[in-house]
A protein has these predicted regions:
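Helix-coil boundary and N-terminal low-complexity module in membrane systems
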Residues: 1-135, 144-145, 162-164, 169-267
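Alpha-helical transmembrane segments of multi-pass membrane proteins
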Residues: 147-159
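Short helix-loop junctions at transmembrane helix boundaries
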Residues: 139-140
Length: 267
């Protein structure tokens, strides 16, 4: 499968596939361990900034629905840009580039606001539409409902995977959003087995802490709060960017460099 998809150690003669796999895994944990403290800081910053969006999602289904809707509206205008800023920080950690956490986060929020705003809106609204559609087909029953529900579920998986690639491309390339989404969709399909594996890892972590919160007991709430506020978000992001960055780099960055080299030679 090519776990995490990186090649920090180049593949050469005499190196088995299993050995390369081990090197990739070791490289991931080595990088994550060295950046652990910085990732906690980035996690706290991102968690605090998207907290209104999280609260909005939770409260819209409660007796505080009006407050939830207000917070959700705020989230519509901030979630995408905040996520792009967070992704920039994580990408730089993966690339082993220096990061000025607060200033870089603020700067990237401003720089990528326009292009990441619509993606953030899609990220909030589209899952709601999928959930409504899935519940509808679940209730009507029958084979048609099963097939339709399967299609909705597959669409949700592809949608989540597209985000793996869209935000790193937003903070790296000067492309229009439709081109970013097109490329992200191609990556989602071409690298589907690896993407699905990473989605399962990410989903398991988020699901665990979400279930702790929904347990409605004090210990569960504390576990959920500590997990989400300190490391869950940055760990999921680091796993994802560490995996997809090599694919983006190989397919888009090296290609751009080759085209630039040809252009210079022709001059």
């Amino acid at each position: 499968m090519g776990l995490f998809g990186t090649n920090y150690n180049k593949e050469g003669k005499g190196v088995s596939k299993d050995e390369r796999e081990k090197r990739r895994i070791f490289a991931f944990f080595d990088e994550y361990g060295r950046k652990f403290g910085a990732l906690i800081k980035a996690n706290i910053l991102y968690f605090l900034t998207i907290l209104p969006t999280i609260a909005g999602v939770i409260l819209t289904g409660s007796e505080y629905k009006v407050a939830g809707i207000v917070l959700l509206i705020i989230g519509l205008f901030t979630f995408g840009p905040l996520t792009s800023a967070f992704t920039y920080i994580i990408r730089n950690y993966v690339m082993q580039s220096h990061v000025f956490l607060f200033s870089d986060f603020k700067e990237q929020f401003k720089i990528n606001y326009k292009i990441s705003l619509p993606l953030g809106i899609i990220d909030i609204i589209f899952p709601m539409v999928l959930i409504i559609a899935f519940k509808y087909y679940l209730n009507i029953g029958g084979m048609v409902a099963v097939i339709a529900g399967g299609i909705v579920l597959f669409a949700a998986v592809i949608f989540l995977i597209i985000n793996f690639y869209a935000y790193p491309m937003i903070v790296t390339f000067n492309l229009k959003l439709r081109h970013i989404l097109k490329n992200a969709l191609l990556f989602a399909i071409v690298k589907f087995p690896v993407n699905l594996f990473i989605l399962i890892i990410d989903g398991a972590i988020i699901y665990y802490f979400a279930m702790q919160f929904l347990s409605f007991n004090r210990l569960g709430f504390i576990i959920s709060l500590v997990g989400f506020s300190l490391f869950a978000l940055s760990f999921v992001a680091f796993v994802t960017v560490f995996t997809v960055w090599k694919y983006i780099e190989d397919a888009m960055i090296e290609e751009d460099e080759e085209e630039e080299s040809v252009f210079k030679d022709s001059i």
